[in-house]
């Protein structure tokens, strides 16, 4: 009766092994099944090709140098290398285990040290577990998906670091362009100051005009110091990204390129998310955990292994080589007797899988929001640039009128300088918007992942 119950238990568990844990078949979770096992070999080339829309060779060169020298990327590549080695190691588990040994033993007397006996022995042992239920294959697939997830993590790191490097590059370019405007205004104020001082000595201008022009010069110099400090901070951050290599001053002296609209693909449907490395990594991690769940279940099933032993033992070396013995042994193990010990492990595996499902859904939802937010940001900045551009035209005309009125003595120097200051503030505001526009476009382009357009 006990034997019948045992056999029945085996069949019940074998049947359960083919019932995989249920999964929510929502639209978002179904994306995880579409993730590719083929990871792009040269993601840096795809990223650099996407940067061509900015028509900035210095930017492309900088990003390429960051890819070559950044320590975080080097560390990520080492993690990927480690994952590949672990996967190759796990594949070997599907092969038979082979071991061999050679022994020589001698027995001698303690006092007389004469030889009592000598024994030679050798053996070869081959052990192979037959993967009846696919447990070893599931473990191998789990390790493969972990390797794929690590590869996608590496690509995601490349996108993040590329965006960060571009951000610092444009910050430095923006500051250089703004400094150029301040230096131009400083030259104008210096010329105005010389004129005011000569007219003050001649009694034409009052001391108030002298104080006004000196105060304006001090404000400009203060703004220059502030921008130079910001530039130094951005330079230091960029130097860290480059790992202090290829410190070309060309990057630090670049100016913001002239504004031009960027033509990009604005498609942000859910299918495009499959090109995002962070989404692909989350999907691969989920699939890895799924295979882990299956393999944990299958640990409860019987295992069947074959063992082949070839050995020989004799006092003569020639006998060891000429008269070996072989043994063939089969073994069936019933690990399901440890059900109560394994039960918690199964529950933990299920809970982890549910956690990874939630992580995947959250990443997909966040990615959708990012694409929409970046697209909205681009549209808002574009409209703002048009508005500021119109304002600049009006202020330039106003400044020309006020200059004529100041020279005619109709308005004070303070009023004229205020109009001039307003124009240059708006000009720097325009440059800031252009910088924000380029960076918003870059974020949108990289948020679309590594799709090749």
Over which residues does each language-model region extend?
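Acidic, low-complexity, intrinsically disordered peripheral segments
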Residues: 246-248, 260, 429-453
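Sec-dependent signal peptide recognition
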Residues: 2-9
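C-terminal motif of bacterial Sec signal peptides marking the signal peptidase cleavage site
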Residues: 13-15
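Bacterial Sec-pathway N-terminal export signals of envelope proteins
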Residues: 17-88, 253, 257-287, 364
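Periplasmic alpha-helical coiled-coil/stalk elements that build and connect Gram-negative outer-membrane
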Residues: 17, 136, 145, 151-268, ...
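A short glycine-centered flexible hinge/capping loop motif at secondary-structure junctions
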Residues: 200-204, 406-410, 447
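Small/polar (Gly/Ser/Thr/Ala-rich) solvent-exposed segments
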Residues: 74, 94-117, 127-156, 160, ...
